[in-house]
């Protein structure tokens, strides 16, 4: 089964890729199915990039595999 991100709602943790999680609203699922996901699971998701830019965290986008 494939899941699609509808929105990124919030984040928690330090502003470092290894210590940050994002609260994900999944497409076609109710809010009680929202989950906290690590950056590593979402790093290629466009919605995450939009969220990071909007929250002045865009520096995390291009730090992959450094």
Annotate each language-model stretch with its function.
Residues 1-66:
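Long, charged, low-complexity intrinsically disordered regions
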